[in-house]
């Protein structure tokens, strides 16, 4: 749902900024 999309996008942003992924 909508919340899943928001959480998914947030995880991608955090991964990109932190370089953990």
UniProtKB/Swiss-Prot annotation:
UniProt keyword Disulfide bond present: yes
Q: What is its main location?
A: secreted
Q: Which UniProt keywords apply?
A: Amphibian defense peptide, Antibiotic, Antimicrobial, Cytolysis, Disulfide bond, Fungicide, Hemolysis, Secreted
Q: Does the keyword Isomerase apply?
A: no
Q: What is this protein called?
A: Nigrocin-2JDa
What is the protein's species of origin? Odorrana jingdongensis
Q: Which GO terms describe its biological process?
A: defense response to fungus; defense response to Gram-negative bacterium; defense response to Gram-positive bacterium; hemolysis in another organism
Which cysteine pairs are joined by S-S bonds? 15-21
Tissue expression:
Expressed by the skin glands.
Q: Where in the cell is it found?
A: Secreted
Task: Give a short account of what the protein does.
Answer: Has antibacterial activity against E.coli ATCC 25992 (MIC=16 uM), E.coli CIB 84492 (MIC=16 uM), S.aureus ATCC 25923 (MIC=16 uM) and S.aureus CIB 85462 (MIC=8 uM). Has antifungal activity against C.albicans (MIC=63 uM). Has hemolytic activity against rabbit erythrocytes.
- GO CC, any one term: extracellular region
Family assignment? Belongs to the frog skin active peptide (FSAP) family. Brevinin subfamily.
Q: Which InterPro entries match?
A: Nigrocin
């Amino acid at each position: 749902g909508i919340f899943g999309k928001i959480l998914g996008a947030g995880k991608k942003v955090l991964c990109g900024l932190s370089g953990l992924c």
